[in-house]
Amino acid sequence: MKILGIETTCDETAAAVVTVGEEERGRILSNEVLSQIAEHAAYGGVVPEIAARAHVEVLDRLIARALQRAGTTLPEIDGIAVAAGPGLIGGVLIGLVTAKTLALVARKPLLAVNHLEAHALTPRLTDGLAFPYLLLLASGGHTQLVAVKGVGDYVRLGTTIDDAIGEAFDKVAKLLGLGYPGGPEVERQAQNGNPERFALPRPMLGRRQADFSLSGLKTALRIEAERLEPLASQDVADLCASFQAAVVDVVVDRVRVALRAFAGVAGHPTALVAAGGVAANGAIRRALAAQAGEVGLSFVAPPLPLCGDNGAMIAWAGLERLRLGLVDDLTVPARARWPFAEAAPAA
């Protein structure tokens, strides 16, 4: 079984072909990604109109390249998976219309994938992970702790009440005059900084629910930065290190709460998983691995190229759905918002 995956929900244009190898393990035959960082850098963030136009310009060629590098052709593909949301609606529409056209012309099943679900299922592609597992899904637009019980069966244990983790990193980078994208720049600066110089708050620590709040942390950093202006290079590094250390502490505390809640909705987890762009952050990965070890769990995070948006995760989610007979018709809509996990019942 071979699935073509198409991803256009934000500022990466991606296409990939995924299959199932020995012992039903996933295998990536090709994974083509074109980033739009250069197009958006001058604006300090993603401009939806620019993103949509960039998708239009390259998507057809990228799909052709993905098929070629996979050593296959469209008639040999068993299904066409596409991220139908959530995301910037212009980009989502471009990917979805392209996938619908290919499915119609080639007479292949259309598999409309939730972009967040694709992140959630990535460890099954990379590590063959069994259900259920606890997922920290953290990106520029989303931060959630989810009990992943099965394909299409997700229980949200916690979410952010304001900024997503990746969004907070990006805003801090912009405030400090760092480059775009902000997350990697903050992490790079933090490597040369003192994480104990600034006593930044750890919002929500000790709360019974597994929710996040990062706006107060971001405000506290801004106050410190304004107090020190003009900022020396060491000031910037120390601010980044202190901010990152605070985020790590918050993440670990929230994960502890979610682990306690997990048993009530899904039994015993097979692993602690991090996915999404923020899962590429080394400090967060190390802290989560240590936390998992403390409670006797393995820690799983995708290889760095699969943390960000990519076509392989879309293709894999489509493959998982196709194996269950979950096929979509050509009227499936594009969605700017598309929650993928139900909230856990109130305690």
Curated annotation (Swiss-Prot):
Its EC number is 2.3.1.234. GO terms for molecular function: iron ion binding; N(6)-L-threonylcarbamoyladenine synthase activity. Pfam families: TsaD. PANTHER family: TRNA N6-ADENOSINE THREONYLCARBAMOYLTRANSFERASE, TRNA N6-ADENOSINE THREONYLCARBAMOYLTRANSFERASE, MITOCHONDRIAL. It is found in: Cytoplasm. Fe cation binds at residues 115, 119, 309. Required for the formation of a threonylcarbamoyl group on adenosine at position 37 (t(6)A37) in tRNAs that read codons beginning with adenine. Is involved in the transfer of the threonylcarbamoyl moiety of threonylcarbamoyl-AMP (TC-AMP) to the N6 group of A37, together with TsaE and TsaB. TsaD likely plays a direct catalytic role in this reaction. It comes from Methylorubrum populi (strain ATCC BAA-705 / NCIMB 13946 / BJ001) (Methylobacterium populi). It catalyses: L-threonylcarbamoyladenylate + adenosine(37) in tRNA = N(6)-L-threonylcarbamoyladenosine(37) in tRNA + AMP + H(+). Keywords: Acyltransferase, Cytoplasm, Iron, Metal-binding, Transferase, tRNA processing. The lineage of its organism: Bacteria, Pseudomonadati, Pseudomonadota, Alphaproteobacteria, Hyphomicrobiales. This is tRNA N6-adenosine threonylcarbamoyltransferase. Its main location: cytoplasm.
